[in-house]
């Protein structure tokens, strides 16, 4: 399809993002790429992150740089651009990076195609996620960017500046960037250093590559915001009654924050003792497993669910410490 197929042709209210304001933003009406638009999910947009990301999306800077979101596991780094795309109806592809990934993996590959009548064989180019996003104007999210080998990330330098992309796999086609192409990267590290020493598999990236990003820190949410996220997974019943007691959810969020404070990877932990932390993702899983444990008539639904969703991943010493915190918190 032509590069100009995808274009801003409607507006979306900022209320779609949870903010009370008359402001509206350019967005997309129905298009041929609906299959690539992320599903809209419950998400708490934090103003301090939402505003700079939104500004960047519509700015000329987005044609000269990528946007790197860094923060602890499960803090909403990847969900932020995905859920913004969902509300703007902007097609978006997320790629999970790894140390063996190459630029060719992102560009695409050539396969043999056999004519069913004549038996003649021809080659056909199958575009990869980068090629699709570059050509059509999608958002590309390179998740866990700091897992990439430095030779691969260096090979991507040109795309952050919207330079022409040469498709060697497609007979040397020179592909110009769609003006709406945007690229995000996410990582537990900011690409240059793992201060905790706990992020196994991450690679120190080349400074010249990381210099091509605007970088934002994505910490865990405030207690009240995280509580709202939990509550959104357990809406009231038709009679308006709670399906999950709020006082229990509050204690769960408080416990998650206690664990984070004692996490070795937390720069403010003052010598913490835990080698694993409880993310918002783990917190949601814990709450859902509490419901499951109640339904199967578990002896202690809260502690058993905590084991299933979090503590069983830890060493016996750390698991015992987690269970002790739970007993003190929940009785």
Model feature map: region roles:
Residues 1-331:
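C-terminal regulatory/interaction module of P-loop NTP-utilizing enzymes
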């Amino acid at each position: 399809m032509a590069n100009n197929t995808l274009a801003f042709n409607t507006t979306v209210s900022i209320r779609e993002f949870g903010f009370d304001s008359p402001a509206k933003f350019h967005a997309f009406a129905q298009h041929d790429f609906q299959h690539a638009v992320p599903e809209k999910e419950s998400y708490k947009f934090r103003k301090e992150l939402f505003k700079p990301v939104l500004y960047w999306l519509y700015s000329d800077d987005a044609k000269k740089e990528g946007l790197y979101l860094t923060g602890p596991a499960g803090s909403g780094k990847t969900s932020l651009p995905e859920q913004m795309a969902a509300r703007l109806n902007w097609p978006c592809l997320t790629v999970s990076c790894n140390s063996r990934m190459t630029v060719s993996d992102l560009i695409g590959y050539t396969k043999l195609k056999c004519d069913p009548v004549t038996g003649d064989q021809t080659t056909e180019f199958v575009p990869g996620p980068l090629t699709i996003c570059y050509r059509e104007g999608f958002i590309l999210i390179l998740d866990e960017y700091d897992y990439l080998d430095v030779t691969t990330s260096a090979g991507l330098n040109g795309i952050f500046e919207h330079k022409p992309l040469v498709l060697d796999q497609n007979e040397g086609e020179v592909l110009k960037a769609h003006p709406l192409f945007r690229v995000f990267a996410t990582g537990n590290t900011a690409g240059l250093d793992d201060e905790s020493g706990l992020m196994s598999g991450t690679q120190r990236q080349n400074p010249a590559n990381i210099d091509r990003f605007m970088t934002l820190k994505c910490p865990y949410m405030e207690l009240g915001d995280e509580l709202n996220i939990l509550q959104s997974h357990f809406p009231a019943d038709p009679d308006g009654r709670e399906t999950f007691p709020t006082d229990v959810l509050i204690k769960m969020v408080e416990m998650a924050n206690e664990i984070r404070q004692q996490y070795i990877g937390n720069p403010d932990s003052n010598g913490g003792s835990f080698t694993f932390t409880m993310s918002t993702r783990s917190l949601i899983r814990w709450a859902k497993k509490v419901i499951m444990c109640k339904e199967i008539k578990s002896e202690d639904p809260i502690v058993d669910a905590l084991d299933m969703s979090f503590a069983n991943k830890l060493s016996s010493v750390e698991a015992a410490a987690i269970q002790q915190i739970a007993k003190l918190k929940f009785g």
